[in-house]
C-alpha cells in the first residue's frame, strides 16, 4: 500500500457507532448485527456508485472483522475469501477489493507473474515492495486483469488499485504524467469491463483528468497536508471520497472534511479493524 459529506443525516460519513462514542477508539467499533437482506442485484450494466458522505471501513490487515456497522467495506482482495464477501453482502454491505497496482509485493501468490524487467526501486518504508514500470502496459495489463478477475469472482462490488501515482515517486523509472494517466485509465477500463466500480487512490494532481474515469476516490492524509479541497471534483460529480488520517485526531480534521463532503475517519497506519470516524 502507499503508502488520505454532504450534510445529510442518513449518510453522515462522520457518524460513529456506540463503541466509538463510549471509548477512546482502542478497539474495533460496533458489535455483530442481525443479518440484513443482501443488496439487490444492479440493473444490467449498471455499476455501484457510492455517494458522498457514505460511511466506510478500511481494513487491510488480515481477514476482515465483519462486525463494524457501516455500509461499505474496503478489504484486501487476496486475504479475504468469497465467503467473507458473501457474509458482508448478507449484512447489506458493499465491498471494495484492495490490491497493489503500482508496486510488486514479494508475499503475493502471483508474484512470479511479474518479469524482473518491470521491477524497479524499493518502495521505501514498505518491506518486500518494489515499484513496477507502469509504461509496460503489455506486461502489466494481463496481470492486473487477473487480479480484477479474482475480485469479480469473489463477488466484490469495486476495486481499489493502490500506488497509482508512481510518477511522483523515485521508482527507478523515468515515468511521466502521461504514463500515469495511461496506466490508471487502463485499470479503470479493466474494472468497468468486468462490471466493477473503481477507486482513484490519492493521485491528487490528476483528479481533473481522471474524475470522469473513476467512480470514487480513496485518499490518505489530505487534511494533514492541506489538500482536501483538491478532492472536491469527485464530490461535485456525486462520487464518494473515502478519506483517512493517521496522525491527526478527528477533532483536528472532521469539521473541514465534513463540510467538504468527505467520508472521513482516523485509522492506524497498519489498517487493522480499529477506527474513529468523524
Model-derived segments and their meaning:
Residues 42-129, 134-135:
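N-terminal carbohydrate-binding/catalytic regions of secreted carbohydrate-active enzymes
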Residues 99-160, 164-229:
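Chitinase-like catalytic core of GlcNAc-active glycosidases
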Amino acid at each position: 500500500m502507499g503508502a488520505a459529506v454532504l450534510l445529510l443525516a442518513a449518510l453522515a460519513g462522520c457518524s460513529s457507532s456506540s463503541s466509538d462514542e463510549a471509548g477512546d477508539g482502542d478497539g474495533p467499533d460496533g458489535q455483530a448485527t442481525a443479518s440484513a437482506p443482501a443488496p439487490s442485484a444492479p440493473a444490467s450494466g449498471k455499476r455501484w456508485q457510492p455517494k458522498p458522505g457514505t460511511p466506510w471501513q478500511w481494513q487491510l490487515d488480515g481477514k476482515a472483522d465483519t462486525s463494524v456497522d457501516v455500509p461499505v467495506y474496503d478489504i484486501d482482495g487476496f486475504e479475504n475469501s468469497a465467503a467473507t464477501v458473501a457474509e458482508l453482502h448478507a449484512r447489506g454491505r458493499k465491498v471494495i477489493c484492495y490490491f497493489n497496482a503500482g508496486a510488486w509485493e514479494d508475499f503475493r501468490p502471483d508474484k512470479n507473474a511479474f518479469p524482473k524487467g518491470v521491477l524497479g526501486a524499493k518502495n521505501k518504508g514498505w518491506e518486500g515492495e518494489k515499484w513496477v514500470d507502469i509504461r509496460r502496459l503489455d506486461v502489466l495489463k494481463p496481470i492486473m486483469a487477473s487480479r480484477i478477475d479474482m475480485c469479480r469472482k469473489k463477488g466484490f462490488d469495486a476495486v481499489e488499485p493502490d500506488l497509482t501515482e508512481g510518477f511522483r515517486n523515485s521508482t527507478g523509472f523515468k515515468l511521466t504524467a502521461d504514463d500515469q494517466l495511461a496506466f490508471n485509465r487502463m485499470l479503470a477500463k479493466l474494472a468497468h469491463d468486468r462490471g466493477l466500480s473503481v477507486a482513484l487512490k490519492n493521485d491528487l494532481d490528476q483528479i481533473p483528468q481522471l474524475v470522469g474515469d473513476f467512480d470514487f476516490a480513496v485518499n490518505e492524509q489530505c487534511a494533514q497536508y492541506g489538500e482536501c479541497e483538491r478532492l472536491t471534483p469527485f464530490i461535485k460529480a456525486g462520487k464518494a471520497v473515502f478519506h483517512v488520517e493517521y496522525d491527526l485526531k478527528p477533532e483536528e480534521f472532521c469539521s473541514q472534511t465534513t463540510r467538504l463532503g468527505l467520508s472521513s475517519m482516523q485509522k492506524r497506519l497498519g489498517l487493522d479493524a480499529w477506527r474513529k470516524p468523524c
